[in-house]
UniProtKB/Swiss-Prot annotation:
Source organism of this protein record: Helicobacter pylori (strain ATCC 700392 / 26695)
A GO biological-process term: protoporphyrinogen IX biosynthetic process
E.C. code: 1.3.99.-
Enzyme's top EC category: oxidoreductase
Subcellular localization(s) per the UniProt record: Cell membrane
Full protein name: Protoporphyrinogen IX oxidase
Amino acid sequence: MGFLNGYFLWVKAFHVIAVISWMAALFYLPRLFVYHAENAHKKEFVGVVQIQEKKLYSFIASPAMGFTLITGILMLLIEPTLFKSGGWLHAKLALVVLLLAYHFYCKKCMRELEKDPTRRNARFYRVFNEAPTILMILIVILVVVKPF
């Protein structure tokens, strides 16, 4: 990856852009689940929300997740000494794995809502919506402060 050495900061900038896009989608998608669950009895409304869920997941969240992973891996390949910079990186990567699990669980929620919109109530999705915020806060603290 020597040919990319001079581009580390560019890759990092695109990584930040991708993360922002991914997080925006993960913040909004469960809010759509809330609307979906609250209005399960309104077929037309549910139809519109389902389209929004699918488009947000397929055209924003998933590509942003992929680009986040690609640029993150590229940064580690360009600068492998990051692995030796402290335990903060390993903790961050563990939290990223949780974000990935959350991302794919959102897809499962979409399928469940499509089959049975009354399976979980809106309150569940409101609480569920907090997870990416908490993970993001922890990741940002680890990356900026590098506490260990």
